Amino acid sequence: MEGDGDKLQSAVIVPRHIALVMDGNGRWAKIRGKERCEGHAAGVDALRVALRAAAGCGVEYLTAYTFSTENWNRPEEEVRALMGLFVTAIMNEMLDLMTNNIRLLAIGDFSRLPEDVRESLEKGIRETAGNTGLTLVLALSYSSRWEMTDVIRRLARKVRDGSVEPEDINVDLVSDHLSTAGIPDPDLFIRTGGEKRISNFLMWQMAYTELFFTDTLWPDFDADCLKAAIEEYSSRERRFGKTSEQIALRENKY
């Protein structure tokens, strides 16, 4: 992995957390006369490249939208193939994750996942728990609407049980009940494949995230593409509701 981040200029501000929608696997396969499952397999290879590049650039967290709750509505054959691919990919990538000191986490409604997928995830999370490099978060059977509904349900139970007062519910308490509790909000969102929407992904967490869209299909997204996105992110002014003058004044203090 050495050298993956060498081409970034020293002045570039690297996002701590990147959220990623890996779109375009099916179209990539169709253009080449291949089956959709072959496009998804190529997408796994692209994620491996992106992981190494992100770690080389100094990114601490990368959350990949791997399978949404809406994806359960895809043809049964494709869903079955994707589930098998998840198991194979996790098993095959374990050595690479360990070698590159990458920690694996996952978020989503795991109750809908097949048992072998859950077992593979649990094994990967357990075996990489001690790694201290980049954290890869797989969003599997995930959507923001599912997540917020789950948060509301759990907080409602706590109010009913008397452990939480309605007046105690604030932004911090909601954040503490999210699937991503303990993980910083994304600084940069990247979506490949040409679509310009976030597709029910980390909607609470991305309140102030910088959005980057590219026409590049996911299997073609390489290290140079990632670095270009980071450099674009670095050129933007993140104000978080403040004015440019307030940001400049704050920066001048340091």
From Swiss-Prot:
Its cofactor is Mg(2+). It comes from the Bacteria. Mg(2+) binds at residues 23, 210. The active site is at residues 23, 71. CDD domains: Cis_IPPS. Substrate binds at residues 24-28, 36, 40, 68-70, 72, 74, 191, 197-199. Transmembrane segments: none annotated. Belongs to the UPP synthase family. Homodimer. This is Isoprenyl transferase. It comes from Porphyromonas gingivalis (strain ATCC BAA-308 / W83).
